[in-house]
Amino acid sequence: MPNLLSIENLSWQVFDKTILNNISFNVARGEVLGIIGPNGAGKTSLLRCITHQNSHVRGNKLSGVVTLENRIISQYSAKELAQHFALVAQKTEAIFSLNVYDIVSMGLLPPKPLFSMDSTADKNNISKALEVVGLSHALSQSFNDLSGGEQQRVLIARALVQGSQILVLDEPTNHLDVYYQHQILRLVTSLQLTVIMTVHDLNLASQYCHRLLLLNKGALVCDGPPEKVLTSELLSNI
Protein backbone atom coordinates (compact mmCIF):
# COMPACT_ATOMS: atom_id res chain seq x y z
CA MET A 1 0.00 0.00 0.00
CA PRO A 2 1.40 3.45 -0.89
CA ASN A 3 2.17 5.85 1.94
CA LEU A 4 -0.41 8.56 2.50
CA LEU A 5 1.23 10.23 5.49
CA SER A 6 4.88 10.48 6.48
CA ILE A 7 6.34 11.68 9.78
CA GLU A 8 10.10 12.25 9.92
CA ASN A 9 12.12 13.10 13.04
CA LEU A 10 9.18 14.78 14.74
CA SER A 11 9.96 16.46 18.06
CA TRP A 12 7.75 18.79 20.07
CA GLN A 13 8.65 20.89 23.07
CA VAL A 14 6.45 23.32 24.98
CA PHE A 15 8.74 25.73 26.80
CA ASP A 16 11.31 23.34 28.35
CA LYS A 17 9.10 20.24 28.47
CA THR A 18 9.66 17.58 25.82
CA ILE A 19 6.33 16.21 24.60
CA LEU A 20 7.52 14.14 21.62
CA ASN A 21 11.08 13.10 20.85
CA ASN A 22 12.37 12.27 17.36
CA ILE A 23 9.46 10.18 16.08
CA SER A 24 9.40 8.79 12.53
CA PHE A 25 6.86 6.53 10.81
CA ASN A 26 4.65 6.27 7.72
CA VAL A 27 0.95 5.57 7.33
CA ALA A 28 -0.22 3.63 4.29
CA ARG A 29 -3.45 4.41 2.48
CA GLY A 30 -6.22 2.20 3.89
CA GLU A 31 -4.23 1.21 6.98
CA VAL A 32 -5.69 1.00 10.49
CA LEU A 33 -2.94 2.33 12.77
CA GLY A 34 -3.23 2.13 16.54
CA ILE A 35 -1.20 4.28 18.93
CA ILE A 36 -0.72 2.75 22.37
CA GLY A 37 1.21 3.56 25.52
CA PRO A 38 0.74 4.60 29.15
CA ASN A 39 -0.95 7.82 30.22
CA GLY A 40 1.28 10.77 29.39
CA ALA A 41 3.18 8.87 26.71
CA GLY A 42 2.32 11.48 24.05
CA LYS A 43 -0.46 9.67 22.17
CA THR A 44 -2.91 12.58 21.93
CA SER A 45 -0.04 14.99 21.35
CA LEU A 46 1.05 12.93 18.36
CA LEU A 47 -2.46 13.12 16.91
CA ARG A 48 -2.35 16.91 17.33
CA CYS A 49 0.93 17.10 15.42
CA ILE A 50 -0.30 14.82 12.64
CA THR A 51 -3.42 16.96 12.14
CA HIS A 52 -1.53 20.27 12.54
CA GLN A 53 -3.47 21.36 15.63
CA ASN A 54 -0.49 22.38 17.71
CA SER A 55 0.94 25.23 15.65
CA HIS A 56 -0.45 28.00 17.88
CA VAL A 57 0.44 26.56 21.29
CA ARG A 58 2.26 29.07 23.49
CA GLY A 59 5.93 28.17 23.95
CA ASN A 60 5.75 25.82 20.99
CA LYS A 61 9.00 24.36 19.61
CA LEU A 62 8.34 21.93 16.79
CA SER A 63 10.88 20.23 14.56
CA GLY A 64 10.74 17.50 11.95
CA VAL A 65 8.53 17.09 8.92
CA VAL A 66 4.96 15.85 8.52
CA THR A 67 3.94 15.30 4.90
CA LEU A 68 0.52 14.40 3.55
CA GLU A 69 0.45 13.11 -0.01
CA ASN A 70 4.05 14.35 -0.44
CA ARG A 71 3.14 17.89 0.65
CA ILE A 72 4.29 19.44 3.94
CA ILE A 73 1.37 19.66 6.34
CA SER A 74 1.95 23.35 7.17
CA GLN A 75 1.31 24.21 3.51
CA TYR A 76 -2.32 23.07 3.76
CA SER A 77 -5.08 25.55 4.56
CA ALA A 78 -7.56 24.79 7.34
CA LYS A 79 -10.15 23.95 4.68
CA GLU A 80 -7.79 21.53 2.94
CA LEU A 81 -6.90 19.85 6.23
CA ALA A 82 -10.60 19.33 6.97
CA GLN A 83 -10.95 17.66 3.59
CA HIS A 84 -8.19 15.21 4.51
CA PHE A 85 -8.65 14.66 8.26
CA ALA A 86 -11.88 13.94 10.14
CA LEU A 87 -11.24 14.06 13.88
CA VAL A 88 -13.29 12.33 16.56
CA ALA A 89 -11.99 13.61 19.89
CA GLN A 90 -12.40 11.85 23.22
CA LYS A 91 -16.07 11.73 24.22
CA THR A 92 -17.41 15.14 25.17
CA GLU A 93 -20.80 16.30 26.32
CA ALA A 94 -22.96 18.28 23.92
CA ILE A 95 -22.92 22.01 24.67
CA PHE A 96 -26.60 22.26 23.78
CA SER A 97 -29.25 19.58 23.79
CA LEU A 98 -29.06 19.24 20.01
CA ASN A 99 -30.63 16.41 18.10
CA VAL A 100 -28.65 13.84 16.16
CA TYR A 101 -29.31 15.40 12.75
CA ASP A 102 -28.02 18.84 13.84
CA ILE A 103 -24.85 17.40 15.35
CA VAL A 104 -24.05 15.34 12.26
CA SER A 105 -24.73 18.35 10.02
CA MET A 106 -21.88 20.19 11.78
CA GLY A 107 -19.49 18.00 9.80
CA LEU A 108 -20.63 19.33 6.44
CA LEU A 109 -18.03 21.12 4.32
CA PRO A 110 -18.03 24.02 3.91
CA PRO A 111 -19.41 24.65 7.43
CA LYS A 112 -22.92 26.06 7.59
CA PRO A 113 -24.69 28.10 10.26
CA LEU A 114 -26.49 25.95 12.81
CA PHE A 115 -30.19 25.48 12.01
CA SER A 116 -29.70 26.72 8.43
CA MET A 117 -31.55 24.95 5.61
CA ASP A 118 -29.58 22.06 4.16
CA SER A 119 -29.62 21.21 0.47
CA THR A 120 -31.03 17.92 -0.76
CA ALA A 121 -27.47 16.70 -1.34
CA ASP A 122 -26.52 17.61 2.23
CA LYS A 123 -29.58 15.84 3.63
CA ASN A 124 -28.73 12.75 1.61
CA ASN A 125 -25.14 12.89 2.87
CA ILE A 126 -26.32 13.09 6.49
CA SER A 127 -28.85 10.30 5.99
CA LYS A 128 -26.21 8.06 4.42
CA ALA A 129 -23.76 8.68 7.29
CA LEU A 130 -26.43 7.85 9.86
CA GLU A 131 -27.31 4.72 7.93
CA VAL A 132 -23.66 3.63 7.93
CA VAL A 133 -23.45 3.96 11.73
CA GLY A 134 -26.85 2.33 12.23
CA LEU A 135 -28.71 5.36 13.56
CA SER A 136 -31.15 6.25 10.78
CA HIS A 137 -33.98 5.91 13.28
CA ALA A 138 -32.48 8.43 15.71
CA LEU A 139 -32.03 11.59 13.61
CA SER A 140 -34.55 13.61 15.66
CA GLN A 141 -33.48 12.29 19.06
CA SER A 142 -31.57 14.45 21.53
CA PHE A 143 -27.87 13.61 21.65
CA ASN A 144 -27.97 13.66 25.45
CA ASP A 145 -30.66 10.95 25.52
CA LEU A 146 -28.50 8.43 23.66
CA SER A 147 -26.32 5.73 25.18
CA GLY A 148 -22.55 6.20 25.24
CA GLY A 149 -22.10 3.90 22.26
CA GLU A 150 -24.79 5.69 20.28
CA GLN A 151 -23.24 9.08 21.06
CA GLN A 152 -19.89 7.88 19.78
CA ARG A 153 -21.52 6.61 16.59
CA VAL A 154 -23.12 10.04 16.09
CA LEU A 155 -19.69 11.67 16.36
CA ILE A 156 -18.32 9.20 13.81
CA ALA A 157 -21.23 10.03 11.49
CA ARG A 158 -20.37 13.72 11.87
CA ALA A 159 -16.81 12.88 10.80
CA LEU A 160 -18.03 10.82 7.85
CA VAL A 161 -20.05 13.64 6.29
CA GLN A 162 -16.81 15.60 5.88
CA GLY A 163 -15.84 13.11 3.20
CA SER A 164 -12.26 13.05 4.51
CA GLN A 165 -9.91 10.22 3.61
CA ILE A 166 -8.27 9.90 7.05
CA LEU A 167 -10.30 9.22 10.19
CA VAL A 168 -8.46 10.23 13.38
CA LEU A 169 -9.89 9.02 16.69
CA ASP A 170 -8.67 9.75 20.21
CA GLU A 171 -9.65 6.87 22.53
CA PRO A 172 -12.88 6.07 20.63
CA THR A 173 -13.88 3.38 23.14
CA ASN A 174 -13.18 5.40 26.28
CA HIS A 175 -15.88 4.96 28.98
CA LEU A 176 -17.82 2.43 26.89
CA ASP A 177 -18.75 -1.07 28.03
CA VAL A 178 -17.29 -4.09 26.24
CA TYR A 179 -20.24 -4.52 23.87
CA TYR A 180 -20.04 -0.94 22.59
CA GLN A 181 -16.23 -1.03 22.42
CA HIS A 182 -16.37 -3.83 19.88
CA GLN A 183 -19.35 -2.28 18.10
CA ILE A 184 -17.49 1.01 17.57
CA LEU A 185 -14.23 -0.59 16.43
CA ARG A 186 -15.99 -3.01 14.08
CA LEU A 187 -17.68 0.03 12.55
CA VAL A 188 -14.50 2.09 12.28
CA THR A 189 -12.46 -0.69 10.68
CA SER A 190 -15.22 -1.51 8.17
CA LEU A 191 -15.30 1.98 6.63
CA GLN A 192 -12.43 1.39 4.16
CA LEU A 193 -10.74 4.60 5.25
CA THR A 194 -7.26 5.25 6.56
CA VAL A 195 -7.69 5.17 10.34
CA ILE A 196 -5.32 6.52 13.00
CA MET A 197 -6.47 6.06 16.58
CA THR A 198 -5.18 6.00 20.12
CA VAL A 199 -6.21 2.82 21.93
CA HIS A 200 -6.01 2.13 25.67
CA ASP A 201 -7.10 -1.51 25.67
CA LEU A 202 -4.33 -3.72 24.29
CA ASN A 203 -6.70 -6.58 23.46
CA LEU A 204 -8.75 -4.23 21.28
CA ALA A 205 -5.57 -2.86 19.69
CA SER A 206 -4.45 -6.38 18.83
CA GLN A 207 -7.82 -7.35 17.38
CA TYR A 208 -8.64 -4.31 15.25
CA CYS A 209 -5.37 -2.61 14.21
CA HIS A 210 -3.17 -3.59 11.28
CA ARG A 211 -0.19 -1.96 12.94
CA LEU A 212 0.73 -0.42 16.29
CA LEU A 213 2.99 2.36 17.51
CA LEU A 214 4.09 1.95 21.13
CA LEU A 215 4.96 5.27 22.76
CA ASN A 216 6.57 5.92 26.13
CA LYS A 217 7.68 9.27 27.54
CA GLY A 218 7.24 10.91 24.14
CA ALA A 219 9.43 8.43 22.27
CA LEU A 220 8.53 5.72 19.78
CA VAL A 221 9.53 2.43 21.41
CA CYS A 222 8.27 0.01 18.76
CA ASP A 223 6.49 0.11 15.39
CA GLY A 224 5.04 -2.99 13.82
CA PRO A 225 2.19 -5.50 13.66
CA PRO A 226 0.46 -6.29 16.98
CA GLU A 227 2.30 -9.60 17.42
CA LYS A 228 5.63 -7.73 17.28
CA VAL A 229 4.66 -4.84 19.56
CA LEU A 230 2.56 -6.60 22.19
CA THR A 231 5.28 -8.77 23.68
CA SER A 232 5.77 -9.23 27.41
CA GLU A 233 9.40 -8.15 27.07
CA LEU A 234 8.52 -4.79 25.53
CA LEU A 235 5.50 -4.08 27.71
CA SER A 236 7.31 -4.96 30.95
CA ASN A 237 9.71 -2.09 30.33
CA ILE A 238 6.93 0.50 29.95
Q: Where in this protein do the model-derived segments appear?
A:
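Conserved ABC ATPase "signature" C-loop
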Residues: 217-218
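The feature captures the beta-strand-to-loop junction immediately N-terminal to the Walker
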Residues: 36-38
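Helix-to-loop junction immediately C-terminal to a conserved catalytic motif
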Residues: 51
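Catalytic Walker B motif of ABC-type/P-loop ATPase nucleotide-binding domains
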Residues: 167-171
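Conserved ABC ATPase signature
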Residues: 142-146, 150
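Conserved ABC ATPase "signature" region
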Residues: 105, 120-138
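ABC ATPase NBD Q-loop/coupling interface
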Residues: 65-80
